[in-house]
Design a protein with these regions (language model features):
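Aromatic-glycine hotspot motif
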Residues: 1-47, 52-154
Length: 154
């Protein structure tokens, strides 16, 4: 494993295996779905957003391979109509996602993304990360593949 991969895993492992994993053990489904303040997102939304950004970021932008989301009908398993990362969602959409998301499906999706992330990071070195991304490819992923809603993409 390269030094950059080792450093990443030193940070990623406690985040995923302690902090994020702990939420599933101590936070109730009702707590996962509620918003602590009208302008804050639910834990379920935050977990989904983290997984979506990680999935798209590493799989599409770093490795230029299909996302985990597309490997096993994850939108169906999570009971969601969205494939974007949610950054441009309205408060009403955040409420809808928080209410309808299948939490077991979300948990399994996050675990699948984390497994893929570990496999990717084990292969990374500085040459992979130094490769520039073509504007057309970024446009394809962001707009055509639906990572960001068209009205939010400019």
């Amino acid at each position: 494993m390269s030094p950059i991969s080792t450093l990443f895993m030193h940070r990623y492992t406690p985040l995923t295996e302690f902090y994020l994993a702990g939420f599933w053990q101590v936070v109730t489904p009702d707590q996962m779905r509620q918003r602590p303040h009208p302008r804050l997102n639910s834990i379920a939304w935050v977990m989904w957003h983290i997984a979506r950004v990680e999935d798209a970021g590493l799989n599409r932008f770093v490795m230029q391979q299909p996302q985990v989301l597309d490997s096993a009908d994850w939108t169906v398993q999570m009971n969601l109509p969205w494939r974007n990362h949610g950054g441009e969602m309205t408060l009403a959409e955040v409420d809808e996602l928080s209410a309808r998301i299948d939490l077991d499906g979300l948990h399994r999706y996050m675990q699948a993304v984390q497994t893929r992330t570990r496999a990717i990071v084990a292969t990374l070195d500085e040459t992979v990360l130094a490769q520039p991304l073509e504007h057309a490819f970024v446009q394809q992923v962001v707009v055509d593949e639906g990572l960001v809603l068209r009205n939010a993409a400019g």
